[in-house]
C-alpha cells in the first residue's frame, strides 16, 4: 500500500503562488493551485488571450525569462500529476477542519458552480488590489484604475483610450504610462502626487539615511529599471508632473478633461496652480493594498495592512502560510522569493520534518534586501496628509451604494461615528457588491478613521443556493 502524500492548496497563481507550487511539488507534496483567472501569472505576468494571436507578448513584460521558467515548470508538474491547476475558481472561504482545511470556491465566470478542495496545508498567495482616493468626477466613464488600464493592454491588447492622463502615486504609474505610450496611446502627462526624489533625500536621522542608502544600493537593477522608464517617458514626450494631483475630472456623458494642480507639503492643492488637460481617459491609482480577506476569515494576525508571517512565511494559524503581496506590497521579485520559501517550508512540515533554512538562504537574502528597498519606496510614496480635505461633499465615495463624502462627514460630525463599521451602519458605505474593497480607503480618509479590515466569514458574495446545498465533492487530486 502506497503512503498517502500530503496535499497543499496554493491560492493564487501569481508570482508567489507559482513559486510556492513549484517548490512544494518538487519536494513530494501534491499541490492544488487554485486561481480565479483563466491562465496563470497574476497581474504581473498577465498574458493576452490565445485567440488574440499576439506575436510579441514579451514586449509587454519585464523579466520574460523568469515567466517562461515558471510557465514551463508548472506545465511539467501538471503533466506529471504533481500539480492540479484549478483555473477560474473564485475562492470564497477557507474552512478549518480537524484533519486540515477545505477550500471553497465557485467555478467559472458565472461563479455559481460550487467546488471544494481538501488539503493538509494552505499557502495564501492572494496578491494585492489597487486603491483609488475619490475626487470630483472620478465616477465618469473614461476614468479607470491604472491597473485596469494595464490589464486591458496586457490581457486584451486594447488601449483604454486615445488620449490618456496617468495620475495618482506609486511605482505602478511608470510601467502603465510607458506601456500605453509604447502601444500607441497619446499619454499627455504622468501626474505623480509624491516626490520620488525623497528616495535619495537625506532624512533627519543619520541612521535612517545610512539604512536608506544601503537599501537602495542593494538593488541596482531596480534603479536601472526606473531609469529605463524615465528614458521611455522622454522618448514618447510624456510630460512628467511631480508633486501634482488630478483634483477633478470633467465631462457630460464621459470624461473630456481633467484638472491637475500642484500640492503643498501636506497634500493640499496650491491656489493658482490648476490647469486643465484634455483627455478621453484618466488612468488613476494610489498604490496597492494586500488582499487579506481569506486570511482574515482564518483568523490570521495582520502586521499593518498585510498578513504577519515568520521567517518561514508561516502565519500564526498552524498549517497556513502566506506569501507575496498578501504580506505587504513589494513587487514580483519579492513575491517569488517569499513564495519559494513558503513552498519549501510547507513541503518539509507537511512531511513531518523540520525545515533547514540553509536550503533557501539565497531566497531569504533576496527577501531581506527587497523588503528594505520597498520600505524606502513606501516612505517616498506616502499618502499626502490632507488629501481628503479637498474631497467635496457632493463627491461619491462609495460607488455601489452612491454614498457621498458629505454623508460620511455627517455620520462622523453629527451622529458620532468613530470607526469604519459605524460609518458603514449609518451610511451603507461598503455594503454594496464590492463589500468595501474599492471604497474603504476613501471612506476612511474622509471620515478620519483608521483603515481596519472587517473580518467576514465569506471573502466574496456567494449565492444562497450554494450555502444551502450539500457539500460538493472534493476537486483535489486523487489519492
Residue ranges and their predicted role:
Residues 11, 34, 116-127, 278-286:
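Short hydrophobic core segments
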Residues 69, 74-105, 183-286, 290-291:
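A Rossmann-like FAD-binding core segment of flavoenzymes
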Residues 4-6, 111-121, 270-280, 316:
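Core beta-strand elements of the Rossmann-like FAD/NAD(P) dinucleotide-binding domain
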Residues 6-69, 177-220:
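Beta1-alpha1 glycine-rich phosphate/pyrophosphate-binding loop at the start
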Residues 128-165, 170-176, 304-312:
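Glycine-rich dinucleotide-binding loop and its adjacent helix/turn
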Residues 2-16, 162-170:
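Beta1/beta-strand and adjacent pyrophosphate-binding region of the FAD-binding site
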Residues 323-354, 358-362:
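A conserved FAD-binding loop/helix module that cradles the flavin
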Residues 145-153, 265, 269, 281-330:
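FAD-site-proximal beta/loop scaffold in flavoenzymes
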